[in-house]
Structures are given as C-alpha cells and as structure tokens.
C-alpha cells in the first residue's frame, strides 16, 4: 500500500487580497485544504493616531478621527467630543442630542450595508453588492445635505453639532426610512433561506457565550453568541432612553447568527430614526457655553512661527486634570476612548479602544480545523476595518 506524507504548507494571504477588507495579512498553515494554524499580521495601516492626538487640541484632532473607521465616521466623531464633554460637564441641548442619534443610526445602517455586500461577495453572491450600494447612496445624499460631506463629515462639535438640519431634510429622511424598511425584507427574502448561503455560514465560526465574554468581544459578535449587551441600553447615552427599540441578539454564535443580528439592527436603527425625526424638539443645536475658550499661544508679529508655521492657534478650552473612559456602541462593537487631561489644551493620553482590534484576536481560534474557503466567511462575519485596527 502506497503511503504519502505531506508537509504542512505555509501561505500568505494578503495584504492585497480582495477579501482581506483592507491591508490585513494572514500567514496560514495548511494541511491540504484544512487550516492548521493562522497568524494575523497587523500594522500596515498604522498612522500613530494616538500620538497625533497628544499634539493636537480636540478641535484640531476632529478631522483625523474620521480616518479610524472610515465607513462609520459619525461614531468616531461622537466619541471624540463625548470625552471632553464628560470631563468638563458640558450639557448637550436636546435638539443636538436628537440630531446626533439620527446621524449615528444612519451611519450604522450605512456601515452594515457595506458589510453585507462584500460579505455576500466573499461567499460568492455578487448581486446584493449592487443593491446595498443603491441604498447606501441615499444615506450619503442625506449626509451631504446636512454636513456638506459624503464620508468624512466633521459634523460633531463639543456641546452639539456644527450646523442645524437644513430645510426639508427631516421629510427627506422620513421618506428614506419608509423606503428602506421593505428593502431589508427584500434582502432577507433574497439571502436568508438560500441553500448555498446556509451551507456556507451555518455552524461555521462558532463562538460560545463564555468564549465571547472571555475574549472581550463586543457588538454583533457578542450579541450573536447570546449576550444581550448593547451600550445604547446599558449606558443610555444621548437620548436613546427616550425611544422605543429592542436589542437584537441570537443564541447560535455562528456566522449565520452574526448576519441575522446585523440585519435586525438595520431594522431597529430605521425605527429609532423614525421616532427621533417625529419627536425632534426645537431649540439650539449647540451649547454656546462650550465656547469657553482659553486661547493658545499667540505668535509674535513676524517671528519664526508667523513666517514659517503660518497658522493661528485654534480656539479651544483646557482639558481638566482628570481621567475618563467614554464608550459608544459602534456598528462593529464597543468603541471607547480613555482620556487623561493635564490642565492643558492637549490631552496627556488618548487611548483608543477600537472594536475591530479586539474582535480580530479570536480569528486564529475560529479558523483552526476549518477549510481554507471558510477563512473568508469567518473573517467577513467579524467585520473589521483596518483603519481602526491599526490606527
């Protein structure tokens, strides 16, 4: 009888593989088609975001944060202004709070849509990609009307938002909500009971409830394993406590459960938007008290700074000598910032807790013993963006 012994094969997937969702590199050890080991290599998109924050005022740093998770930029802005607001005890007006919630939930829908399309393409279904782009374009049109930018909005400010909603925007947004809910049902009819789809995702990448908690997972990854943990309910930030909605969760813990959680979240987000639009109060859209400014250093007339640096110090207030951790429920999980002030206009320490970085840690555990083709399905179901993983 002929016996063949094969050595394990080590291959490198990425960093420019179409299914890697950015510049992730996986060093995969294979025995035939079976995965023996997998080692993620990070850092290709590292831009020293935390160090930059320590040399900028909060106002100056706002345009940078939209480059972490560049598909859900409202959340990175929200966390950036929430930290100094909590430290300095700045009240956010009711209207601004409602506007923020509407923007955050629109951003969540856009992020989940752009997760769904590529995830289905990874599995082999190309059609949904074109459907999700159609809906996502409408959300970006709403963003452009309100903020002037389709993606990097730079809309949140300490104590409120940059500008009020333009005339007719609320009606346009309500029209979109009415249009979008049946579309989610359409996605479900198209995808959920498809036998090929179910073969690829059911019982693939299983995470138990205990594992999810021990690995520190958050967001849809945690809720798909049977843990009902949503920071919008737990922390009641902004005006989520005044609206009627349910936490979406599943108990199966596989790729199918994570898909169903995100689909359910799109529905709930639309309901939140509809309620917020109908209940939005009048009043100011920013707290003018937040403009308690202590100017930075003034440059002398015609000195080195005036000639070569050529910038005015941006008006800002000092961050008190305290430390604080703030968090929001981003589409991918718990996005948090640990801020340490030093009675200075610059933060002394700015630590980013990005959900993607923590969620991707479990990847080697999930793919071990699976087939090579399942790596794409499992990685897609985790939903990572390398901008926030590498920072």
Curated annotation (Swiss-Prot):
- The question of whether ATP-binding is a record keyword is answered with no
Task: Give the keywords, sorted.
Answer: Chloroplast, Membrane, NAD, NADP, Plastid, Plastoquinone, Quinone, Thylakoid, Translocase, Transport
List the InterPro entries.
Answer: NADH_Q_OxRdtase_suD (IPR001135), NADH_UbQ_OxRdtase_49kDa_CS (IPR014029), NDH1_su_D/H (IPR022885), NiFe-Hase_large (IPR029014)
The entry's localization annotation reads: Plastid, Chloroplast thylakoid membrane
Q: What class of enzyme is it?
A: translocase
Give GO cellular component annotations, separated by semicolons. chloroplast thylakoid membrane
- What is the membrane topology here? Peripheral membrane protein
Q: What Pfam families does this protein's entry cite? A: Complex1_49kDa
The reaction(s) catalysed by this protein are: a plastoquinone + NADH + (n+1) H(+)(in) = a plastoquinol + NAD(+) + n H(+)(out); a plastoquinone + NADPH + (n+1) H(+)(in) = a plastoquinol + NADP(+) + n H(+)(out)
EC identifiers of the protein: 7.1.1.-
GO BP, sorted A to Z? photosynthesis, light reaction
Q: Which GO terms describe its molecular function?
A: NAD binding; oxidoreductase activity, acting on NAD(P)H, quinone or similar compound as acceptor; quinone binding
Major subcellular location class:
plastid
| The protein's role, per its UniProt record | NDH shuttles electrons from NAD(P)H:plastoquinone, via FMN and iron-sulfur (Fe-S) centers, to quinones in the photosynthetic chain and possibly in a chloroplast respiratory chain. The immediate electron acceptor for the enzyme in this species is believed to be plastoquinone. Couples the redox reaction to proton translocation, and thus conserves the redox energy in a proton gradient.
Give the record's subunit note. NDH is composed of at least 16 different subunits, 5 of which are encoded in the nucleus.
Report the sequence similarity comment from the record.
Belongs to the complex I 49 kDa subunit family.
Question: What is the recorded name of this protein?
Answer: NAD(P)H-quinone oxidoreductase subunit H, chloroplastic
Organism, by scientific name, is Mesostigma viride (Green alga)
């Amino acid at each position: 009888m002929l016996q063949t012994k094969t050595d394990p094969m080590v291959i490198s997937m990425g960093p420019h593989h179409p299914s890697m969702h950015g510049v992730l590199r996986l060093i995969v050890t294979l025995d035939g088609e079976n995965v023996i080991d997998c080692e993620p290599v990070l850092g290709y998109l590292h831009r020293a975001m935390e160090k930059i924050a320590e040399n900028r005022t909060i106002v100056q740093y706002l345009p940078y944060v939209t480059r972490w998770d560049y598909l859900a930029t409202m959340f990175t802005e929200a966390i950036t202004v929430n930290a100094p607001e909590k430290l300095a005890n700045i009240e956010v007006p009711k209207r601004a709070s409602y506007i923020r919630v509407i923007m955050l939930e629109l951003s969540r829908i856009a992020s989940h849509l752009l997760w769904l399309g590529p995830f289905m393409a990874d599995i082999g279904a190309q059609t949904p990609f074109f459907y999700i782009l159609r809906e996502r374009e409408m959300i970006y049109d709403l963003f452009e009307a309100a903020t002037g930018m389709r993606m990097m909005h730079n809309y949140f400010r300490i104590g409120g938002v940059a500008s009020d909603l333009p005339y007719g925007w609320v009606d346009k947004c309500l029209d979109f909500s009415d249009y979008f809910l049946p579309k989610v049902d359409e996605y479900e009819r198209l995808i959920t009971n498809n036998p090929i789809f179910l073969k690829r995702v059911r019982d693939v990448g299983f995470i138990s409830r205990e594992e999810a908690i021990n690995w520190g997972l958050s967001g849809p990854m945690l809720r798909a394993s049977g843990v009902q943990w949503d920071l919008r309910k737990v922390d009641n930030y902004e005006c989520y406590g005044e609206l009627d909605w349910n936490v979406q969760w599943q108990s199966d813990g596989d790729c199918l459960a994570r898909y169903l959680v995100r689909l359910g979240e799109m529905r709930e987000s639309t309901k939140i938007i509809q309620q917020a639009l109908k209940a939005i109060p009048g009043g100011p859209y920013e707290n003018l008290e937040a403009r308690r400014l202590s100017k930075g250093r003034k440059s002398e007339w015609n000195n080195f700074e005036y000639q070569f640096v050529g910038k005015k110090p941006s008006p800002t207030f000092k961050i008190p000598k305290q430390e604080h951790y703030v968090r929001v429920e981003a589409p991918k999980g718990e996005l948090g910032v640990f801020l340490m002030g030093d009675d200075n206009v610059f933060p002394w320490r700015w630590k980013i807790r990005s959900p993607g970085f923590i969620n991707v840690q479990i990847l080697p555990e999930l793919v071990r013993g699976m087939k090579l083709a399942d790596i794409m399905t499992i990685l897609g179901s985790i939903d990572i963006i390398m901008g926030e993983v590498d920072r």
